[in-house]
Each structure stands twice: as C-alpha cells, then as structure tokens.
Amino acid sequence: MSLDMKEHPDAEVQKNRVLTLEDWKDKWVTRHISFHQEQGHQLLKKHLDTFLKGQSGLRVFFPLCGKAVEMKWFADRGHTVVGVEISEIGIREFFAEQNLSYTEEPLAEIAGAKVFKSSSGSISLYCCSIFDLPRANIGKFDRIWDRGALVAINPGDHDRYADIILSLLRKEFQYLMAVLSYDPTKHAGPPFYVPSAELKRLFGTKCSMQCLEEVDALEERHKAWGLDYLFEKLYLLTEK
C-alpha cells in the first residue's frame, strides 16, 4: 500500500502529546533507546553520494544526535560534525563506542550545558536542549541529517524547531530528513507521525522538497505498539 493512501486524517490526535527533556534523559538511563541504529541508517548510506555531492570540508549538523554512528562516517570523510543531544550518557557513549578521545567544557552561554569535542576537533557535541542551542552561536551548516529528530520533537514544538533548523542553513544547503508514517490513533508517539502536509507547512516556503525513497520499515517492536504498517520516507530539502 502506498504511503499517499495512508496520509492519515487523524494527525491531530497527537498534537498535545508532550515529552519533557527529563523523559528523554530517563530513556538513556533506563536503556529505552531502541531508536539507536548500531549499523547506521541504511537509507542515508544508500543516498550518501546524492547528499554530499562530492564536496569536501562540509559542516554537517545532527539535531538530537544521540550516539549516531553516522557522525563518525562524516568526520572520517573529512567533514566537520556538530550535534546536539540532551543526554550526556548518549554523548559519552558515542565517543567511547567510536574509540575517540575527547574534551568537555561548560558552555558559558547556556546554564548547565556542556560541549564535548573530539581531540581531532572534527566532532563537537552540545549537551543541551536544541531550543537553547541558538545562544551558543554554532554557525551555519552545508548539510543537516535529521533522523529521529523532527519525529521526536513534541508536535506543539514543530514551529520552534523548524525556525531553528532554517536559521542554521547556509546557501546551497542539503537537508536530508527521515520521517515516519503510521496510524497515529494506534501509537501515541514518539516517534511521532509527521505527514507530508506538515513538512510543507514547516519548510515549504524556504525549501524545495523531494522524496528520494519510501520503504516499509515495520519491525516486530512496532507491531507490539499496535501498528500494522509503518513507512519511512526520506526527503531531500534544498534551497528554493
């Protein structure tokens, strides 16, 4: 069944659902991190050349990065990676699992926040809320890889999120995003259901949107949530 047939009219059902930053920190403490992909994201791997366009020395942003292994992929290719993640556990595990030495220091601009930097200087991970991140003046980016980010943001915060993302984009950017489609009356989220109409509303004025691929992503754990279908859709957003 195609995704378009499954554009659910009940997207509103999730609009008041809220997870706090503490809720997300607790997921790392209690190891409820089934969202982490140890082998990396296969659609990103498949479309990596399209995303990078053969360019070198790019700045790549990972919103809500967790311990995504893809950050190492980009750094190994000579790019500079910046991520933001609320869980210090996730950040420390990234460096440990990738065998990278790092430094950490408090961020003067944001109370309680820290920045963790690989000794090579190619990876900087900010431990704070993405909504506080603009105060750190992290600059602009050539590429953004958004997997498990927009779909993890409380639906009521979509506009704030989109404003921050758009503010981080350089000229001639490529913004690659993976979103999920399922019946939101059967699962409260996260990950949240983000219909294409919502993407257009959030990003359509500034970005051209192209769907690169749609795959059936239903796993046993999703069936346990009560879902009978789940599609993942990969979008490439570029400058209008």
From Swiss-Prot:
<dbReference type="GO" id="GO:0008119">
    <property type="term" value="F:thiopurine S-methyltransferase activity"/>
</dbReference>
<dbReference type="InterPro" id="IPR029063">
    <property type="entry name" value="SAM-dependent_MTases_sf"/>
</dbReference>
<dbReference type="Pfam" id="PF05724">
    <property type="entry name" value="TPMT"/>
</dbReference>
<dbReference type="GO" id="GO:0032259">
    <property type="term" value="P:methylation"/>
</dbReference>
<dbReference type="InterPro" id="IPR008854">
    <property type="entry name" value="TPMT"/>
</dbReference>
<protein>
    <recommendedName>
        <fullName>Thiopurine S-methyltransferase</fullName>
        <ecNumber>2.1.1.67</ecNumber>
    </recommendedName>
</protein>
<dbReference type="InterPro" id="IPR025835">
    <property type="entry name" value="Thiopurine_S-MeTrfase"/>
</dbReference>
<feature type="binding site">
    <location>
        <begin position="24"/>
        <end position="35"/>
    </location>
    <ligand>
        <name>S-adenosyl-L-methionine</name>
    </ligand>
</feature>
<feature type="binding site">
    <location>
        <position position="64"/>
    </location>
    <ligand>
        <name>S-adenosyl-L-methionine</name>
    </ligand>
</feature>
<keyword id="KW-0949">S-adenosyl-L-methionine</keyword>
<comment type="function">
    <text>Catalyzes the S-methylation of thiopurine drugs such as 6-mercaptopurine (also called mercaptopurine, 6-MP or its brand name Purinethol) using S-adenosyl-L-methionine as the methyl donor. TPMT activity modulates the cytotoxic effects of thiopurine prodrugs. A natural substrate for this enzyme has yet to be identified.</text>
</comment>
<keyword id="KW-0808">Transferase</keyword>
<comment type="subunit">
    <text>Monomer.</text>
</comment>
<feature type="modified residue" description="N6-acetyllysine">
    <location>
        <position position="53"/>
    </location>
</feature>
<keyword id="KW-0963">Cytoplasm</keyword>
<keyword id="KW-0489">Methyltransferase</keyword>
<feature type="binding site">
    <location>
        <position position="147"/>
    </location>
    <ligand>
        <name>S-adenosyl-L-methionine</name>
    </ligand>
</feature>
<feature type="binding site">
    <location>
        <position position="85"/>
    </location>
    <ligand>
        <name>S-adenosyl-L-methionine</name>
    </ligand>
</feature>
<feature type="binding site">
    <location>
        <begin position="129"/>
        <end position="130"/>
    </location>
    <ligand>
        <name>S-adenosyl-L-methionine</name>
    </ligand>
</feature>
<comment type="similarity">
    <text>Belongs to the class I-like SAM-binding methyltransferase superfamily. TPMT family.</text>
</comment>
<feature type="binding site">
    <location>
        <position position="35"/>
    </location>
    <ligand>
        <name>substrate</name>
    </ligand>
</feature>
<dbReference type="GO" id="GO:0005737">
    <property type="term" value="C:cytoplasm"/>
</dbReference>
<keyword id="KW-0007">Acetylation</keyword>
